[in-house]
Regions:
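A structural signal for conserved, well-ordered secondary-structure elements
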Residues: 1-208
Length: 208
């Protein structure tokens, strides 16, 4: 009992309880639901951004990659029966941002190669893009994982699940941005015509 605990502590320590807070299961479920809505909102906003920044085929590839990464993290925690709390939800949001960053790097390189050689075959252009950026992606992921592993080892039990979620998400996001996004573009038969420079882009580039 809480009152009994306070009485026992007062026998050894001189203190005064000025405020008590209790987070019940209802509040916890509300926070979980709000976090889930925030997760969906983040996915929607990112898809709209990629659609306008690149093209809808790239948005579909990014969506599949992000869903894949989220499911991998959730499946990992479910398989090993790890606690899922708000810190893990925050880690999933961070994983979405990390994976999206890799996806944008890949998409930008694919678009650049298509525009350089308009008559290039889609498979050749995408393979060339992967060859050009895979080293950068792997080095970035490895350096990030080193930091996260150190955080897991020395960060304590409080943030252990947060660190685990980020480690799993970074590994998943690395290969999903390379394989899932590019294979989706090949399946959707993206061509150089899909990535023609619009007049608005030309005007923007010509502005001081």
């Amino acid at each position: 009992d809480e009152s009994l605990l306070i009485q026992n502590l007062k026998q050894y320590f001189d203190f005064e309880v000025r405020r008590q807070e209790f987070v019940g299961p209802q509040v916890g479920s509300e926070l979980r639901d709000q976090g889930g809505l925030g997760l969906l909102a983040a996915l929607a906003v990112m898809m709209v951004y990629i659609m306008f920044r690149f093209q809808y085929k790239f948005a579909l590839g990014a969506l599949l990659a992000l869903i894949h990464d989220v499911l991998i993290v959730l499946g990992f925690f479910s398989f090993f029966s790890l606690d899922f709390d708000l810190s893990v939800l925050a880690a999933i949001l961070a994983v979405i941002g990390y994976s999206l960053n890799d996806t944008i790097v890949v998409s930008d390189r694919v678009r650049e190669n298509f525009r350089k050689k308009r008559r290039s075959d889609s498979e050749i252009a995408i393979n060339r893009s992967l060859s050009q950026m895979i080293g950068r992606t792997l080095i970035t992921s490895l350096t990030t994982l080193l930091v996260l592993i150190a955080l897991l080892i020395f960060g304590g039990e409080t943030i252990s699940n947060f660190s685990i979620a980020l480690i799993v998400g970074v590994i998943s996001g690395t290969y999903s941005s390379i394989y899932i996004v590019c294979n989706t573009l090949l399946s959707l038969k993206v061509t150089s015509e899909d990535l023609m420079i619009r007049k608005t882009e030309v005007l923007d580039d010509g502005m001081p």
